[in-house]
């Protein structure tokens, strides 16, 4: 398939899997729409798993690199497993080593037949194409795609956390400190507030955590975070992490991080800082729409996660509407000891 795509002028043929979906994507010249339909219908209607064992080894090696041979990879896996008791977010996207080893072609075929069905598939096409022609070709090439209901999955609801959770690992590494808090899904009315808080605290060198922990106090070599971790379709985490500077401890990081969090509760964000954060957030969304591939990705994400691609543009209005009072309200409700998960990756002592 890769050779056909390349010869037809296609670029970026790839796929990825997250906590919520598997995506297949590439870009084609506009006049190759019918070839795209032919290739994709063949992928989903007549799959061949001839390289199963080769790909299985690739995945095992990827897990070794990302997790088994990575102290922070091991820590993050343990951290997520501690944060979630029942929700599937607790499982690593790549899977556990033994599960991968035990996987058979029959397992894959059974999964494919259950989940790769029209009712569970969303396609985004962006470019110089005629919508009527797209629908006509889709009917031609996907018309025989047998309709089946989505697999009936009753995802367990994560119970409310009632006390701080903590996990500690000792490995051969410079110490890391991780701290997370449960937050609602992307469809929640306060999603934009959480995004602003995440940016305010941990997005880049202008963030409060970087300025305080790295530049002012020299406690950390890096201080970052993420809102919507490990996914955001369902209730998830707002998550912060820092690599300690030589001679500093994870406990010092914890104190400094919580001081910044407490400021959000007690000190309203200034108009200047909030305007900057809103501008950055809006620019980030709009920047993703600058290319056809970026627009397809963004529209697809909102369609799948929120029920409508139009919610992407509604997010712009919600960002603009965030107030200092919103930030204080959400910070007070979210950043509590009962809602906290702590991860400490400590240096393993010799002997």
Enumerate the language-model features and the residues they cover:
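Short, polar/flexible loop-turn hinges at active-site or ligand-entry regions and domain interfaces
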Residues: 43-52, 66, 269-270
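Short beta-strands and strand-coil junctions in structured, solvent-facing domains, enriched
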Residues: 45-46, 131-132, 184-188, 247-250, ...
């Amino acid at each position: 398939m890769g050779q056909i795509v390349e010869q037809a002028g296609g670029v970026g043929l790839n796929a990825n899997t997250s906590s919520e979906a598997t995506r297949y994507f590439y870009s084609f010249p506009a006049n190759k729409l019918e070839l795209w339909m032919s290739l994709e219908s063949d992928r989903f209607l007549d799959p061949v798993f001839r390289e199963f064992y080769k790909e299985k080894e690739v995945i095992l090696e990827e897990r070794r690199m990302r997790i088994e041979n990575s102290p922070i990879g091991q820590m993050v896996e343990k951290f997520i497993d501690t944060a979630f008791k029942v929700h599937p977010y607790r499982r690593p996207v790549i899977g556990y080593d033994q599960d991968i080893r035990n996987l058979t072609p029959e397992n894959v075929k059974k999964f494919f037949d259950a989940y790769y069905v029209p009712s569970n598939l969303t396609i985004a096409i962006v470019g110089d194409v005629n919508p009527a022609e797209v629908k006509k070709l889709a009917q031609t090439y996907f018309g025989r795609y047998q309709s089946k209901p989505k697999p009936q999955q009753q995802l367990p609801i994560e119970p409310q956390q009632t006390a701080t959770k903590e996990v500690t690992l000792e490995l051969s590494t410079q110490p890391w400190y991780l701290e997370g808090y449960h937050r609602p899904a992307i469809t929640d009315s306060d999603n934009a507030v959480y995004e602003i808080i995440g940016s305010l605290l941990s997005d880049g060198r202008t963030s409060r955590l970087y300025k305080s922990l790295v530049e002012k106090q020299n406690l950390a070599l890096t201080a970052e975070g993420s809102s919507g971790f490990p996914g955001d379709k369902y209730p998830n985490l707002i998550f912060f992490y820092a690599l300690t500077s030589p001679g500093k401890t994870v406990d010092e990081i914890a104190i400094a991080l919580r001081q910044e969090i407490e400021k959000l509760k007690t000190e309203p964000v200034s108009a200047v800082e909030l305007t900057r954060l809103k501008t950055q957030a809006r620019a980030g969304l709009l920047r993703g729409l600058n290319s056809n591939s970026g627009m397809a990705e963004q529209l697809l994400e909102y369609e799948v996660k929120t029920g409508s691609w139009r919610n992407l543009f509604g997010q712009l209005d919600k960002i603009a509407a965030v107030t200092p009072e919103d930030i204080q309200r959400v910070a007070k409700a979210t950043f509590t000891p009962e809602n906290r998960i702590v991860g400490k990756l400590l240096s393993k002592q010799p002997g």
